[in-house]
């Protein structure tokens, strides 16, 4: 095991023609995150001193999407092969560091596998990640003599005998910086593709008497690349299946693991139940005994113990204390906060609003820029009118207030503790404590009224 510093080169210059997209291939997402970001995260977790990103097509889009300050951007103006890509990055290599080569369209490579590869690299030699396939057609074959790796032959350049070899190159390797620069300088494009192959450094190393150690990944999916949307969708399901399995083994009840998507990180308590077609995005925390109904989307939120989220509810950047109930068909937008035992029912929307302990907003309501006290009843059809076309204003409702149905609260406005708002009221001025506010037009009644008759 070597303890050298290490830098990582990520090849991400390909256009991705078979994706049929204006977006660079490596920016297409897996589990809600760009493929290349998965690789960058692995490199950073591995402790890379520098991450050199070799880019070409769609460079402006890449730079807009990837904000990692640790990235060194390396332009490959012409795509002349993997060896050529590494040659562009070579001036940045330190002689005494390890250089690990990764690919922006191989998103599921694990830190554990890369660490094993790094540990296995012999002094002065190369660590090479390989796999054995039943059908290796199209891949570079690993050639050996007396069990030792001697080189890699690309499929188009291989003889019929070499094409029978099942061990193939994944493209992922690690070597010393000084050695890498020397070997890269010796590459030629004398092959069927007319390209500079990074794989040729294996034969160069062998000719120098250097040892090449092959390591296999834990799972084949770790080294599967993406060239089209079908392959990407398959890797998405592989990834989601792995995440679901981890959650099940950790005690989370997923009613159907095949219909659950995790697009971020999930921290959870005990006895959590998640129904079908639920999507978890960003950083989500679920307390003990949380229940989430079918079709819900939870993003960057904290859900307290004993909360129940009914079907088809969307929760984003929200915070729920214990024993809250939400939905079905509710929407909590950024800044929504529910205190203990609060209830938000169907077709209720909250944004930048706090609902106090035991308070309820049961139906068809919008609460925006609002601070609502404890034990408040918000009647159906209540709207906080928080926007005048230019600025937002706040509504404050004290404890123990009863708001009748079809009420409009025109902010800025304050409703005092214990007040009652009659149904159909438009509140434009502050309401005092324990007062009744009513602004309905007086009802009139005309006896013997006859409806108009349609003219023939």
From Swiss-Prot:
Residues 1-229 are annotated as: Pyrophosphorylase. It comes from the Bacteria. Pathway: Nucleotide-sugar biosynthesis; UDP-N-acetyl-alpha-D-glucosamine biosynthesis; N-acetyl-alpha-D-glucosamine 1-phosphate from alpha-D-glucosamine 6-phosphate (route II): step 2/2; Nucleotide-sugar biosynthesis; UDP-N-acetyl-alpha-D-glucosamine biosynthesis; UDP-N-acetyl-alpha-D-glucosamine from N-acetyl-alpha-D-glucosamine 1-phosphate: step 1/1; Bacterial outer membrane biogenesis; LPS lipid A biosynthesis. Homotrimer. PANTHER family: BIFUNCTIONAL PROTEIN GLMU, NUCLEOTIDYL TRANSFERASE. In the N-terminal section; belongs to the N-acetylglucosamine-1-phosphate uridyltransferase family. This is Bifunctional protein GlmU. It comes from Shigella dysenteriae serotype 1 (strain Sd197).
């Amino acid at each position: 095991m070597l303890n050298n510093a290490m830098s990582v080169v990520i090849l991400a210059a390909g256009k991705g023609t078979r994706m049929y997209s204006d977006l660079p291939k490596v920016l297409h997402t897996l589990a809600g995150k760009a493929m290349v970001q998965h690789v960058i995260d692995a490199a950073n977790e591995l402790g890379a001193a520098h991450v050199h990103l070799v880019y070409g097509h769609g460079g402006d889009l890449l730079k807009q999407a990837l904000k990692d300050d640790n990235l060194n951007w390396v332009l490959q103006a012409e795509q002349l092969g993997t060896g050529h890509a590494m040659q562009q990055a070579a001036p940045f290599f330190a002689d005494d560091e390890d250089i690990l080569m990764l690919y922006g369209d191989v998103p599921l490579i694990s830190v554990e596998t890369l660490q094993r590869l790094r540990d296995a690299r012999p002094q002065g030699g190369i660590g090479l990640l390989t796999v054995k396939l039943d059908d290796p057609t199209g891949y570079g074959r690993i050639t050996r003599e007396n069990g030792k790796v001697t080189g890699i032959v690309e499929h188009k350049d291989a003889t019929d005998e070499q094409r029978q070899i099942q061990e193939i190159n994944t493209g992922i390797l690690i070597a010393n910086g000084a050695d890498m620069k020397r070997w890269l300088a010796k590459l030629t494009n004398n092959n069927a593709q007319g390209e500079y192959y990074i794989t040729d450094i294996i034969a160069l190393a062998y000719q120098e008497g250097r040892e090449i150690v092959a390591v296999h990944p834990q799972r084949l999916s770790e080294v599967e690349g993406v060239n089209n949307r079908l392959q990407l969708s398959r890797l998405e399901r592989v990834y989601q299946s792995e995440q679901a399995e981890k959650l099940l083994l950790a005690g989370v009840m997923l009613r159907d693991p095949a219909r659950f998507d995790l697009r971020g990180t999930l921290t959870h308590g005990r006895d959590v139940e998640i129904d079908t077609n639920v999507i978890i995005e960003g950083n989500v925390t679920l307390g003990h005994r949380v229940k989430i109904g079918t079709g819900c989307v939870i993003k960057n939120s904290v859900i307290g113990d004993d909360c129940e989220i009914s079907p088809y509810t969307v929760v984003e950047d929200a915070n729920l204390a214990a024993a809250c109930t939400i939905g079905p068909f509710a929407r909590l937008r950024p800044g929504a906060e529910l205190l203990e035992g609060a209830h938000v029912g169907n077709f209720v929307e909250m944004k930048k609003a706090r609902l106090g302990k035991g308070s309820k907003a049961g139906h068809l309501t919008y609460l925006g820029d609002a601070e609502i006290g404890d034990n408040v009843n918000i009647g159906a059809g209540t709207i906080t009118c928080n926007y005048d076309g230019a600025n937002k204003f706040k509504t404050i409702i004290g404890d123990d207030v009863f708001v009748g149905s079809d009420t409009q609260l025109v902010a800025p406005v304050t409703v005092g503790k214990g007040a009652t708002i009659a149904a159909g009221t438009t509140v434009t001025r502050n309401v005092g404590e324990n007062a009744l506010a009513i602004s309905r037009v007086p009802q009139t009644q005309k006896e013997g009224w006859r409806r108009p008759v349609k003219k023939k």
